């Protein structure tokens, strides 16, 4: 079916808005311009709203298979679509883990059956995410692994990481790491700083993260591997990534919205909806993350969408699982706090959430161009509303942003030329 998205505002390379029409057919963009018309096409009225590429999230947790009480591929992908995402990469901490061809085929089948957008599964670096027996990179790549990670835990043995990096390098695959030295966690539930002492809660020191990044960038250099750092949260980690890039090591990094928006002193009480890993750090860490994003040390923004049940998150931090949801609030929160205030341009934010993320894994998504996949969203930058976790499409309600007021909401999401989310009238 031919379609035309009519009367929308699209950013050009200079960051200027131009009124265009966008034609689509067979899941691809066929024309972009002010005078685009297509005979016998379905017309989607853009009403002068901003059009952007569908967002790309390289770090998400969909929980299926194995933990469907927290989230499913259906609910998670629908939540992502509502937030403006059309491509998401699903981490392998499921049950079973995508550590074999059989398990990868199972997950691919579930995705094909339930996903409303593009879901690209990770393969695990080690069997059962144990950090011990390495997986077969070549086999898992052949069955659709977008990259390789044991996210949720850090790989403790340098030899395991090094050997798997060498194997990944042979097959031009990216190794993606949750960096955490288990010997430095100390059963912590939040950042080791001022606030954990005030709340009398065990803390996780910054060095727990940064020491493993420092190790891994040197391993990546020796292995000739491409290496991506998940959810950078400390100034020391930023320094390690910046130094590695300066040395020519093939490293990329992401930052999460919550680490840009919040710091440890914002935590109001012993509330598990404020518990995530890595934890909210100090104000100086947050400032360092901002600077790193602006200077290119950090490449993109990723949500680390991590849903849990209300029962799991209803009490204090000790004993509760780490993680918060992020799909449905990421763009409006960042737009309100940084674009509206003039700290970022709209183009910067959109790029960090789309094309810059796609480039990490050489994905051909996150752009609006003739021949590209017809993945796009409409954003109403004037729309303001209060975040209400009870209204989330995700099964997860675990967010520290409940009750925040934000502007700039995605109101329509198109994936491969089909509307997969539209705001109710």
From Swiss-Prot:
GO biological process, one term: purine nucleobase catabolic process
Cellular component GO terms, alphabetical: cytoplasm
InterPro entries hit by this protein: Amidohydro-rel, DHOase, DHOase/Allantoinase_Hydrolase, Dihydroorotase_CS, Metal-dep_hydrolase_composite, Metal_Hydrolase
Molecular function per GO: allantoinase activity; dihydroorotase activity; zinc ion binding
EC number, as in UniProt: 3.5.2.3
Cofactor(s) this protein cannot do without: Zn(2+)
Binding residues for substrate: 61-63, 93, 277, 308, 322-323
SUPFAM superfamilies assigned to the protein according to its UniProt record, in alphabetical order: Composite domain of metallo-dependent hydrolases, Metallo-dependent hydrolases
Binding site for Zn(2+) 1: 59, 61, 151, 304
Cofactor: binding comment: Binds 2 Zn(2+) ions per subunit.
Record's keyword terms, sorted: Hydrolase, Metal-binding, Pyrimidine biosynthesis, Zinc
Location of the active site: 304
Catalytic activity reported: (S)-dihydroorotate + H2O = N-carbamoyl-L-aspartate + H(+)
Residues at which Zn(2+) 2 binds: 151, 178, 231
Reported function: Catalyzes the reversible cyclization of carbamoyl aspartate to dihydroorotate.
PANTHER family in the cross-refs: ALLANTOINASE
Family affiliation: Belongs to the metallo-dependent hydrolases superfamily. DHOase family. Class I DHOase subfamily.
Protein name, entry field: Dihydroorotase
Gene: pyrC
């Amino acid at each position: 079916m031919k379609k035309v998205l009519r009367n929308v505002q699209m950013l050009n390379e200079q960051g200027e808005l131009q009124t265009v029409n966008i034609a689509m057919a067979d899941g691809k963009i066929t024309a972009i311009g002010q005078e685009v018309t297509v005979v016998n096409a379905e017309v989607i009225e853009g009403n002068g709203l901003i059009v952007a590429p569908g967002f790309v999230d390289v770090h998400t947790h969909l929980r299926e298979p194995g933990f469907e009480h927290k989230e499913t591929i259906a609910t998670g992908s629908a939540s992502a679509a509502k937030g403006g995402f059309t491509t998401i990469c699903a981490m392998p901490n499921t049950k079973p883990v995508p550590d074999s061809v059989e398990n990868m085929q199972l997950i691919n089948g579930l995705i094909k059956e339930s996903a409303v957008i593009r879901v690209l599964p990770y393969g695990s670096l080690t069997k059962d995410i144990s950090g011990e027996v390495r997986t077969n990179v070549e086999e898992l790549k052949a069955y659709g692994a977008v990259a390789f990670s044991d996210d949720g835990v850090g790989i403790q043995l340098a030899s395991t990481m090094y050997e798997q990096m060498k194997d990944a390098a042979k097959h031009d695959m990216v190794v993606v790491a949750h960096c955490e030295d288990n010997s430095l966690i100390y059963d912590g539930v939040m950042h080791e700083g001022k606030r954990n002492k005030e709340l009398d809660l065990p803390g996780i020191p910054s060095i727990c993260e940064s020491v493993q990044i420092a190790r891994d960038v040197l391993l990546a250099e020796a292995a000739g591997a491409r290496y991506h750092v998940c959810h950078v949260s400390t100034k020391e980690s930023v320094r390690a990534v910046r130094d590695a890039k300066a040395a020519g090591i093939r490293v990329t990094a992401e930052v999460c919205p919550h680490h840009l928006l919040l710091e440890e002193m914002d935590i109001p009480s012993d509330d598990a909806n404020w518990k995530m890993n890595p934890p909210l750090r100090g104000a100086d860490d947050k400032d360092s993350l901002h600077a790193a994003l602006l200077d290119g040390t950090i490449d993109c923004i990723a949500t680390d969408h991590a849903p849990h049940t209300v029962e799991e998150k209803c009490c204090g931090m000790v004993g509760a699982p780490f993680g918060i949801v992020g799909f449905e609030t990421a763009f409006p929160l960042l737009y309100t706090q940084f674009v509206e205030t003039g700290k970022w341009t709209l183009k910067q934010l959109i790029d960090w959430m789309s094309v810059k993320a796609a480039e990490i894994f050489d994905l051909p998504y996150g752009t609006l161009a003739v021949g590209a996949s017809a993945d796009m969203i409409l954003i109403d930058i004037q729309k303001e509303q209060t975040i209400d976790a009870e209204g989330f499409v995700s099964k997860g309600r675990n967010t520290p942003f409940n009750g925040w007021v934000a502007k700039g909401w995605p109101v329509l999401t198109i994936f491969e030329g089909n509307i997969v989310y539209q705001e109710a009238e």
